[in-house]
């Protein structure tokens, strides 16, 4: 296990950010239980990667954003990854995720950062307001992975977080530059 990765979990209020983390890390979500507004919590978990290694991840569970509220800038500077959460029964929450993605790109100056998007409340299909294929098309265009999940089915939570941990802790790729010196001792000139 290497360094601890820092992941910021963000989205509109009441989309289930805390419930996702509680269920993922502790299998501790009771459907219908009373919810409380989160100010900020930090969860530390060990997530297995697709390489079979376990990585420590520090999840920053952020306050749900309300209309007109900006996302605090300090989160953009230290995060190794982001989980953007929306609820499939709320078009506004998906629009908030679209805006957050733009904000991350702008604040990080398009620097490499791992982002996954999760559409929560898959169990509320009859109340769906976000078209699944349109959301997937947006995700492909933005070059992020998107999963639809439900905290009522813990198995749906595993793949997005394994992907996240795997991408953030990917071994550095090998250099394409040759390591040995050129055996032909010609001058360094580029002229033919």
UniProtKB/Swiss-Prot annotation:
- Gene Ontology MF annotations: GTP binding; GTPase activating protein binding; GTPase activity
Region (Disordered), start-end ranges: 169-192
Q: Which UniProt keywords apply?
A: Cytoplasm, GTP-binding, Nucleotide-binding
Q: Name one Pfam family in it.
A: Ras
The protein's matches in PROSITE patterns, at most eight in alphabetical order, are given as: RAB
Where, subcellularly, is it found?
A: Cytoplasm
- GO terms, biological process: negative regulation of canonical NF-kappaB signal transduction; Ral protein signal transduction
Q: What is its main location?
A: cytoplasm
Q: Which GO terms describe its cellular component?
A: cytoplasm
The short motif Effector region is annotated over: 35-43
> Which residues hold GTP?
11-18, 61-65, 120-123
Q: Which domain of life is it from?
A: Eukaryota
SMART domains (alphabetical): RAB (SM00175), RAS (SM00173), RHO (SM00174)
User: What pairs make up the disulfide bonds?
Assistant: none
- What does this protein's UniProt record list under function? Atypical Ras-like protein that acts as a potent regulator of NF-kappa-B activity by preventing the degradation of NF-kappa-B inhibitor beta (NFKBIB) by most signals, explaining why NFKBIB is more resistant to degradation.
Sequence similarity: Belongs to the small GTPase superfamily. Ras family. KappaB-Ras subfamily.
Q: What does UniProt say about this protein's domains?
A: In contrast to other members of the Ras family, the members of the KappaB-Ras subfamily do not contain the conserved Gln residues in position and 65, which is replaced by a Leu residue, and are therefore similar to the constitutively active forms of oncogenic forms of Ras. This suggests that members of this family are clearly different from other small GTPases proteins.
Protein's UniProt name? NF-kappa-B inhibitor-interacting Ras-like protein 2
> Could you read off the lineage of the organism from its UniProt record?
Eukaryota, Metazoa, Chordata, Craniata, Vertebrata
Q: Which gene encodes it?
A: nkiras2
């Amino acid at each position: 296990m290497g360094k601890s990765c820092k992941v910021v979990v963000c989205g509109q209020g009441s989309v289930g950010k805390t419930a996702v983390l509680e269920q993922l890390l502790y299998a501790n979500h009771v459907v219908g239980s009373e919810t409380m507004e989160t100010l900020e919590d930090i969860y530390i978990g060990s997530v297995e990667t697709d390489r079979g290694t376990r990585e420590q991840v520090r999840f920053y569970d952020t306050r749900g954003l309300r209309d007109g509220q900006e996302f605090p800038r300090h989160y953009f500077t230290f995060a190794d990854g982001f989980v953007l959460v929306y609820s499939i029964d709320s078009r506004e929450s998906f629009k908030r995720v679209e805006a957050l993605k733009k904000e991350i790109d702008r604040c990080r100056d398009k620097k490499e950062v791992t982002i996954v998007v999760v559409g929560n409340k898959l169990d509320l299909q009859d109340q769906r307001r976000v078209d699944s294929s349109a959301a997937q098309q947006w995700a492909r265009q933005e070059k992020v992975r998107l999963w639809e999940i439900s905290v009522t089915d813990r198995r749906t939570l595993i793949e997005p977080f394994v992907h996240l941990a795997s991408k953030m802790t990917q071994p550095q790729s090998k250099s394409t530059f040759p390591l040995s010196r050129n055996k032909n001792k010609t001058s360094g000139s580029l002229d033919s």
